[in-house]
């Protein structure tokens, strides 16, 4: 038998490599993948998986080790508040230090927080440690937006953020599944310890990939567009004054929508386990349903939003935010809770488009600080929603869900009236 029936000839091998190379180039172009964005995606995957191994179970863990409903609400409020407070300094440090150095510093601070919670199994350790371990997700948010903005063309921003959002959801799906198995297998106390140990290892791997992120050519920009005012002398109020009218209206509607999300956020796991009779592992399945739903939306919606406009998709995502607490009212078993979490996944339908709107409205020389200021104002305001949620939950779970839905409806109407109609 002829040998060439088993092996390709050299010219045929070259053609095969050409076809594969063209496919990979086309795929990377469609998905808006560049060196920095690709390295960032790996970092987000590793850091996010480590965090989600245990953080989503923290409210039940606090309850297990003796924390009250108020402590659960306080911990949830700290997540929101620190996410807000850290956003602006995260943007400032990114503008000042550059993307790589800032990300490495944020990872180091987060690891210190994980070590504290691992060494001291007490609800107070979670409250104190949150000031440290939330550094990655909170401080790095403006940095991740800046990486997209500096690496991609303007008309590719939604796809860049969409891919980033897609990758962020992989840990949100895998983390609770693995974490739920650890908690079911080893119990709440030991299970959280094992999850934290894995989290620390993955955070160290994250830093290794961040080391290779390169700085964009305009990193050393020191003055604003009129070349008279040093960029770093611009105050927080000056950054806020630079907000366009569209960005301000988006901020108001976003605040109302985040109240809708925050009010029931910490208590959904209590509803599922205490009222729905689910195990920790079954709750992990619910989160997986949510993440799969969100992931299926990101790429096609990002492509359509870049092509046809972002505002209709933002309006749709606000509607799904509002529907989630409504569906929880009837969700008292696994099947109905699964449906509710699919609706929760659909709330990510237009999130990349919303973030791309922020990118589009931000001045390039103030980009990271604009993101930080936006999230500082939004999340500082919304942090009170955790206490409101705890108070409503103490009345009844139904009061909590209805209050959330009212906020969502108001936010959706605001966006439609002030932004969507004016496109």
Predicted segment positions?
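Helix-loop boundary and gating motifs at the non-cytosolic
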Residues: 22-82, 246-286
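Central cavity-lining transmembrane alpha-helices of secondary-active solute carriers
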Residues: 74-91, 288-300
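Transmembrane alpha-helix termini and helix-breaking/packing motifs in multi-pass membrane transporters
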Residues: 60, 64, 174-193, 270, ...
